[in-house]
């Protein structure tokens, strides 16, 4: 089984690729929020195992902050609705992470 540290490294690498890609597509925004949600889930499971760090220099957020981050990641249902085209999206709209 892959360790939490290896999974966290993989998510961080994917996030860096998203940042460096600098695309203006909705798909990139959806991928970004999915990775943020996965990162927050890894924080949660690491806390459940009693860890305070995932990678040598990466401290885990406190539990109260972790709960706040999980609440923020729930906004992904809007992105999923956009993906399923149940929300109207104007043609030619630029989506950025900025």
Curated annotation (Swiss-Prot):
UniProt cross-references to SUPFAM superfamilies, sorted A to Z: E2 regulatory, transactivation domain
Any single biological process term in GO: regulation of DNA-templated transcription
Taxonomic source organism: Bos taurus papillomavirus 4
Gene3D superfamilies noted in UniProt: E2 (early) protein, N terminal domain, subdomain 1 (1.10.287.30)
Alphabetically ordered keywords of this record: Early protein
Domain of life (superkingdom): Viruses
Aminoacyl-tRNA synthetase among keywords: no
Keyword 4Fe-4S: no
InterPro entries xref list: PPV_E2_N, Regulatory_protein_E2_N, Regulatory_protein_E2_N_1
Official protein name in the record: Probable protein E3
